[in-house]
Amino acid sequence: MNLIISKGISYGWNVFTAKDYIEFLSDLKGYLNGKLIFINPEESRWKDAPQVSGDKRFGTYPVGVLSNGKNTIEIFFLHYHSEQEAREKWERRIKRINWDKLLVKFNDQNGCTETEVEHFMKLPFKNKLFFTCKEWPNLS
């Protein structure tokens, strides 16, 4: 999942499960204001999910947890080798968000179900895109 922030530049935000990504978007500012902590990958609540357990790289990259004060989500920092590097990139990118030019996108990967698609379609973002290669007959 990615957030495209401004000036046509796409910033990779690594990987969320579809469920956590929708939760993240549902309170974007709350989560972005939360403190990023790191956990041992074996402590991930998603470690047995097919999209995580099937990844041969699992356990070799940092896993972060964010809280908005009510709920927590996990972020898989696939492209970083250390917690320090992941934190530095995360904090730098948060500072660069242009809220006036925010575009959010979602796709049908990482455990996406019709429930997550329905929630995404209802999110109040002015600019959003959903990429899919499937038919979603129950969605209008």
Enumerate the predicted regions with their spans:
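Histidine-anchored nucleotide/phosphate-binding helix
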Residues: 118-121
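Positively charged, amphipathic N-terminal segments that serve as targeting/anchoring signals
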Residues: 1-116, 126, 137
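Conserved beta-strand scaffold positions in the cores of enzyme catalytic domains, especially
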Residues: 128-130
